[in-house]
Each structure stands twice: as C-alpha cells, then as structure tokens.
C-alpha cells in the first residue's frame, strides 16, 4: 500500500505540473496500437486481456500479459499511411513485467513546393517510436506501470527528437468483474526542435472503466479522454457548443461479445470523431469501429476496422506468438 500511495502521489503531481496546450508535436502518438482497443472506439485503458499491445494504452495492463510474447502490428491509416510495430514481453520476478516495442510510421512520398506553390521535387515523412514499459502488481487489486518513450520525426529536411513517459494505474475487483484505470499519457518534452520553437507532446489524461455482465458473455467499457481540459482548443466546432456536446466529445464507449472462451467480437463509438468528421449531407458511420480476435494456445490474432470519415478509414492487425 505504501508503494501504491507513492505512485499515486507522483502521478498526480506530474499531471498537474505538465498539463499542456493542444498545439503539440508528434500527433502520431495518439493513434491506437492495439487492434482490440481500436475496435472499442479507438482507445481503451481498462480491459484486462493477455494482449501486449494494450500496454501502449495503459502501461499498468502489462501485468496481465504472458511472458515471452513476441508481437507484431500493422495499420493502414487513411489509405496512404502505413504503421508497422514489433514488441516483446518478459517477466521480472513474480509480480512485475517488462516490455519493449518499436513503431515505424511511413507517410510515403509527398510533393515539395516553394513559397509560390511550384513543385520542386518530392520528400518523405516518417515517425519512429521506441518504448520500454515496466509494470508491477502492488496487490491483488492494484497494478501500476510506467512507459518511457524515445520519439523521432523526420519530415523532408527537418527532424525533431523528444523524450516522454506514460503513467498508468489499474484497479480490478474479480468479485464484481470490474476494472478501472487512470492514465497520464505523453508527459515530456522535445530535446531537438524542428525550428528552435519548443512544442509540447500531445498530453492526455484518461479514465476508464470496464464491466463484465454477470449473466451474459458481454463486457461494456467507458473511456473518458482529455480530462485535464473541459473544452480543448483543438475541438472542431460545427456550431454546437452546448454543455452536452462538449461532454460527449470526451466519451468513448465500447462493447465486447465473447461467443467462445477464446474469441471476441467488439464494437465501439467515438463521439468526438463522429461530431467533428461526420458528413453533414447524409448519414454515415464516422466514429464507429469494430473488430474480432482469436486466441489459441500459443498464437493471438486481432483485427479491427475504424471509420473516420466518408472517404477515410483504418485497418489494423495484431499478431502475437508465445516463444
């Protein structure tokens, strides 16, 4: 309990000191990495699964993952952007886990123009993330975790380097089949700026809860995002600035259905994505996502699909194997 109180105190102090404005660099850090989390509305910090990619969303969840899992991920994002990832997990003693992962984003070739708009050539853009995660079971109900990040972006002739950390805590009560989490994501700063102007990382404070139903193979999830700011400056306003509209933009909901003990079907809805990217002329499915997962003795597979706009979507696949 003493370790837990120290961890909570450090987490709260760090959040209060490092809350940052939304005009931040390295926006790729907000993309989902777990196909399961992506299928539940694009983010989830409270489901407990043997899925190493979930530790990207909440480092405390790594304590639920098996040791010696080698995992790979791929996402096609908005058609021309490809995201590749790989990671590995290992137990450290009886109550702690260590994980490492790397992610590479390739935006492809783009036209390079001068100040007058004349095309003068092509340039490439890429982002790279190296991350290490440590998680620890404080007790039978509480787990905490921390992730350290080395972040690199290169766009044409300019590049930037940053250091960041994520802090997470999870509470689980098996009697009520209830899991609750709190995460402070992307604390840190640039160590090499693009043009000598310091830009913050995309800080996010999240809370989440997941509950298994007692008499049905269903789990419901609620995730709250951007809790450190009520109305973010980057909320795109379509004219509805009411209290209820702003509240909904902080909410992500999701549901898992378990047809068998080793499969899941999931779906989610992101209110903010729907509000800001919806087609105003016809009813479409912006903000909706869905996925499927299969777990065998040594192999785990997950696939998700998310709709962001009438002309843009994402497809993500995770694969893990026990060595």
Where are these regions (language model features)?
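Bacterial Sec-dependent N-terminal signal peptides
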Residues: 1-23, 255, 323
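Subset of outer-membrane beta-barrel
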Residues: 20-323
């Amino acid at each position: 309990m003493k370790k837990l109180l120290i961890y909570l105190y450090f987490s709260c102090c760090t959040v209060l000191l490092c809350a940052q404005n939304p005009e931040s660099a390295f926006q790729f850090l907000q993309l989902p990495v777990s196909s399961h989390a992506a299928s539940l509305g694009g983010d989830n910090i409270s489901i407990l699964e043997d899925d190493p990619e979930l530790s990207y969303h909440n480092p405390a969840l790594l304590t639920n993952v098996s040791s010696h899992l080698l995992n790979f991920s791929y996402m096609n994002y908005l058609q021309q952007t490809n995201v590749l990832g790989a990671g590995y997990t290992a137990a450290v003693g009886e109550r702690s886990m260590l994980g490492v992962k790397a992610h590479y984003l390739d935006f492809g070739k783009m036209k390079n123009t001068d100040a007058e708009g004349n095309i003068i050539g092509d340039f490439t853009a890429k982002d790279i993330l190296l991350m290490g995660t440590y998680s620890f079971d404080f007790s039978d109900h509480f787990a905490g975790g921390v992730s350290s990040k080395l972040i690199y972006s290169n766009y044409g002739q300019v590049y930037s380097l940053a250091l960041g950390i994520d802090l997470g805590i999870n509470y689980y009560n098996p009697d009520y089949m209830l899991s609750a989490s709190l995460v402070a994501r992307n604390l840190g700063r640039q160590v090499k700026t693009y043009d000598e102007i310091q830009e913050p990382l995309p800080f996010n404070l999240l809370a989440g809860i997941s509950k298994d139903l007692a008499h049905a193979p269903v789990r419901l999830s609620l995730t709250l995002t951007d809790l450190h700011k009520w109305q973010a400056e980057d909320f795109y306003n379509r004219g509805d600035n009411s209290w209820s509209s702003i509240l909904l933009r902080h909410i992500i909901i999701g549901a898992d259905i378990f047809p068998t003990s080793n499969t899941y079907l999931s779906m989610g809805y992101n209110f903010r994505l729907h509000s800001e990217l919806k087609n105003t002329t016809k009813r479409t499915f912006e903000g909706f996502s869905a996925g499927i997962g299969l777990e065998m003795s040594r192999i785990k597979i997950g696939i998700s699909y998310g709709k962001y706009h009438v002309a843009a979507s994402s497809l993500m696949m995770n694969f893990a194997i026990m060595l």
